[in-house]
Structures are given as C-alpha cells and as structure tokens.
C-alpha cells in the first residue's frame, strides 16, 4: 500500500539535460536576442537622374504651344467683337435673327411663340400653314404635270410647272409671309401694306390655278379643274392627279381668303390704316428731298 506521504505520481518529472555542463552552468535567461538593425537598400531616392531630351521635339512643342495661345487670343478677340456688335445692335433696336427652321436644316428665322404677341399667334400660325400649303400645291402640281408629260403632253408644261415652284416658294415667303411676320412683331403699318398687296396676288394665283383656264398651253401646266376634265377621258390616271391638285388649290384659296379677312379686321381695328398713310407720306417726303 502506497504511503500517504509519497510524492504525487502525476507530477511532471524533472527534465535532465544530458548535455549540460557538469560543473554547473547558470541557466539561460528568458531574454530574447535583439534584432539586427535594418540595412538600407541600394536605392538612392535623393539623387537626380539626367534624362537626355530631344531638343528638336521640345522646340516643336513650344512652337505648337505658342500657336495655340495665339489662336486662343484670336478667338477671345473675335468673341469680344461679336459681343460688342450685339450690344450695339440691341441698343439701336436691331434684332439679330438666327436661322432655326426647319430644325434639320435651318434656312430661315422663325419663332412665333417668342416673337409674336399671344393674341396674334393663332393667326400667324394659320398664315404659316397657308405658306406651307402653297409649297404643297406647287409640289403636287409638278407631280401631276410630270404624269401628263410622261403620257405625251410635252415637256414645256413640265418646265412651266417647275418655274412655278422655283419662283413661288421663295417668292411667297419674301413677298407676303415675312412682311406679315414683321408686321405682327414690330407693329409696322408699311409691312401690313406689303402683306395685303402680295397676299391678294397669292389668292388670285391660287384661284386661277384651281380653274386653270386654257390660256397657256391649254392650262395643262397647272393642275386645275378644266385640264382635269379634259384629260380624264383619255388618261384616267393623269385626270385623277389633276383633280387632287384642283382640291389642293381650292383649299388653299379658301383658307387664304379667311386669313386676309382676319388680318384686315385686326388692321382696321388697331388703327394701323392711318399710321400706314402717315408712314407712306413720310417715306415719299424723304424720297423727294
């Protein structure tokens, strides 16, 4: 039976180092070895490195830089000149018009919503519709006359139809649409006078084209009712094209008559008639002097 004073059987036995010095060596301390100081890597960041540059390339860059600076100065000068001219024109009451219509290929300046008084915008839009209607009528007239030419009516009527289109489209804009636009925008009585004169000629032409009497080449250079009846019996397709042109010219005539009535009512009601007479008298006096 084990003695109650026997040592603990579970205690760790003392380790004996067989290589220990028999004479007794002081035990090693738990202190660790101090780390070695870091050695510098062989990169000298403070040293500058001379990279050989291409002097010719540097001179080209400097030359281009000077050219760019000169161009920039020239653009600034032009911008200042343009701003000065715009300011001078604004002080003088001159309106600088920027082409904005049609949107895909601007040819004219057209901004009814911002330049025409609100109570006149509807009438201006309808007048613009009559101008576009004239363009449509003359274009369809070319198509109808082309079919007649193909069917053997001769090339002369086609050339006349082309002349109507080339003269009528810009003529309508310059002679009566633009004067009314200017009259509504600037309240000019003389512009109203120009509009009335040439718009009445426009209405007369549309009525004449709708009838197309046999005055010039039996009237077949215009797609009216008389040539439509004439060619319908022998050439049905040509007759149909002429009847469509007749309908277009009739519609253009009716709407144009309504427009000139409305413009004249506004002209009389606003007292522009007396103003136009005074402006005409002053213009005649200046011309005489």
From Swiss-Prot:
Membrane association type: Multi-pass membrane protein
Keyword Phosphoprotein attributed: yes
Originating organism: Arabidopsis thaliana (Mouse-ear cress)
Localization of this protein: Cell membrane; Cytoplasmic vesicle, Secretory vesicle membrane
Protein name listed in UniProt: Secretory carrier-associated membrane protein 3
Transmembrane feature ranges: 125-145, 157-177, 192-212, 240-260
Protein family per UniProt: Belongs to the SCAMP family.
Known function: Probably involved in membrane trafficking.
BP GO terms, sorted: protein transport
Region (Disordered) residue spans: 1-45
Topological domains annotated Cytoplasmic: 1-124, 261-289
Keyword Membrane: yes
Pfam family, one: SCAMP
Keyword annotations from UniProtKB, A to Z: Cell membrane, Coiled coil, Cytoplasmic vesicle, Membrane, Phosphoprotein, Transmembrane, Transmembrane helix, Transport
PANTHER family registered for this protein in UniProt: SECRETORY CARRIER-ASSOCIATED MEMBRANE PROTEIN 3, SECRETORY CARRIER-ASSOCIATED MEMBRANE PROTEIN SCAMP
Residues where Phosphoserine is found: 34
GO cellular component: endosome; Golgi apparatus; nucleus; plasma membrane; trans-Golgi network; transport vesicle membrane
Positions in coiled-coil regions: 55-93
């Amino acid at each position: 039976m084990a003695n109650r004073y026997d040592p603990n059987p579970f205690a760790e036995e003392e380790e004996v180092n067989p290589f220990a010095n028999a004479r007794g060596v002081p035990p090693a301390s738990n202190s660790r070895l101090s780390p070695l100081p870091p050695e510098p890597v062989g990169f000298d960041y403070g040293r500058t490195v001379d990279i050989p540059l291409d002097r010719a390339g540097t001179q080209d860059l400097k030359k281009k830089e000077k050219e760019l600076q000169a161009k920039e100065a020239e653009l600034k000068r032009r911008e200042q000149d343009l701003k000065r001219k715009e300011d001078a024109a604004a002080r003088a009451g001159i309106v600088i018009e920027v082409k904005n219509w049609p949107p895909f290929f601007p040819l004219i300046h057209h901004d009814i919503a911002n330049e025409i008084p609100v109570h006149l915008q509807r009438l201006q839009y309808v007048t613009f519709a009559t101008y576009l209607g004239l363009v449509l009528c003359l274009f369809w007239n070319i198509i109808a006359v082309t079919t007649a030419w193909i069917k053997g009516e001769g090339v002369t009527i086609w050339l006349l139809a082309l002349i109507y289109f080339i003269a009528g489209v810009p003529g309508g804009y310059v002679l009566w649409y633009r004067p009314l636009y200017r009259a509504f925008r600037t309240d000019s009585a003389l512009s109203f006078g120009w509009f009335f004169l040439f718009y009445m000629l426009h209405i007369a032409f549309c009525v004449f084209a709708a009838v197309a009497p046999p005055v010039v080449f039996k009237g077949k250079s215009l797609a009216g009712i008389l040539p439509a009846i004439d060619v319908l019996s022998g050439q049905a397709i040509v007759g149909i094209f002429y009847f469509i042109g007749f309908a277009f010219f009739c519609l253009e005539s009716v709407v144009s008559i309504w427009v000139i009535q409305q413009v004249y009512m506004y002209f009389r009601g606003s007292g522009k008639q007396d103003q136009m007479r005074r402006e005409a008298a002053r213009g005649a006096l200046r011309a005489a002097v």
